[in-house]
């Protein structure tokens, strides 16, 4: 019995291990994954700091989604983001998730179309609003974000 059980358990472990990255990789092209409450990501190297209401971070070999901001708006509220984003490998985008789950891309960059500095604007709708960083496979980037309202997440 043990001879049969051990190989089956090992096969199950290998199968489950192989499934771990599929959600992260699929998120870049699937708004339904981006809109989910949780985050799914893999990061090989991540350095970050939060000071003076500014999130500074550097990531290498990253894939998936990461919530960087949230706000529970009482009414339609204009929001402004000062953003510096440079991608050296892969692709990255910032997405606003409205309370109804609608995903709006605020900014998308790649090494072919790097963005150094931008001021982004959107309207937070009544309810829970979020902004996520969404990274394609093996993305490396440097980013600084500062929001005029809401809560930056570390």
Question: What do these predicted ranges mean?
Answer:
Residues 105-125:
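Extracellular carbohydrate recognition and processing domains
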Residues 68-79, 121-127:
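Extracellular and analogous surface-interaction loops
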Residues 133-152:
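Edge beta-strands of jelly-roll/beta-sandwich modules across compartments, strongly enriched
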Residues 77-87:
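A short beta-strand element within beta-rich, extracytoplasmic domains
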Residues 89-106:
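Short, surface-exposed beta-strand/strand-loop-strand elements in extracellular ectodomains
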Residues 14-18:
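C-terminal motif of bacterial Sec signal peptides marking the signal peptidase cleavage site
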Residues 23-71:
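Transition segment at domain starts
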Residues 1-5, 10:
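Positively charged n-region of N-terminal signal peptides that target proteins for export
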């Amino acid at each position: 019995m043990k001879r049969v059980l051990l190989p089956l358990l090992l096969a199950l472990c290998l199968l489950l291990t192989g499934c771990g990255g599929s959600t992260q990789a699929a998120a870049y092209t699937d708004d339904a994954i981006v809109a989910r409450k949780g985050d799914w990501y893999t990061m090989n190297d991540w350095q970050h700091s939060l000071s003076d209401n500014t999130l500074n971070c550097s990531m290498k070999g990253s894939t998936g989604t990461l919530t960087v901001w949230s706000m529970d708006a009482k009414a339609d509220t204009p929001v402004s983001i000062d953003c510096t984003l440079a991608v050296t490998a892969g692709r990255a985008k910032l997405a606003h998730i409205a309370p109804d789950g609608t995903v709006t891309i605020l900014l998308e960059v790649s090494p072919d179309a790097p963005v150094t500095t931008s001021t982004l604007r959107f309207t937070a709708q009544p309810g829970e609003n979020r902004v996520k960083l969404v990274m394609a496979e093996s993305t490396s980037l440097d980013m600084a974000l500062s929001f005029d309202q809401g809560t930056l997440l570390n």
